Amino acid sequence: MGELRELCDLKAKSSNFKLGPFDKFKKCVPVRLQKQGYDIQAFHGSSSKMYNRKEWYPYMGLQDAHFYPHFSNIKLCYSFPGACDYNIVHDVSAANKSAQGKSFIYWLTLNTHHPYSELDMLGANTYDCHQPLFNGRQEACRI
């Protein structure tokens, strides 16, 4: 769970875990920013049930969290169960544009990291990864 590491400087020992007690989240970046008057929002293309995020996100300061299927484009990815990142970028952008005052938006990407499924690529906006230039580096090409 990257958000634990990046926002709270914590490490999960397993992906099958219970996170309580929740006092360890008091030093998470979103909690500290809320105390400074920031409006906090979080976005993730998967279900809130994935890793039970619906239970512990509020404790780390991510009370206003948006999960699948509550987006304007809920077309499923091929690589992961949920909305592809390119399908929710408009929701994230709209939240940023409509922010009043200080705002912090945390977007946990779903499918723009390894492994990449060619079925989730945008076609015209990607390179021809079969060119000799990318020989043996097709995954890197699709980044």
Regions found by a protein language model. Give the residues of each.
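Solvent-exposed soluble domains appended to multi-pass membrane proteins
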Residues: 1-143
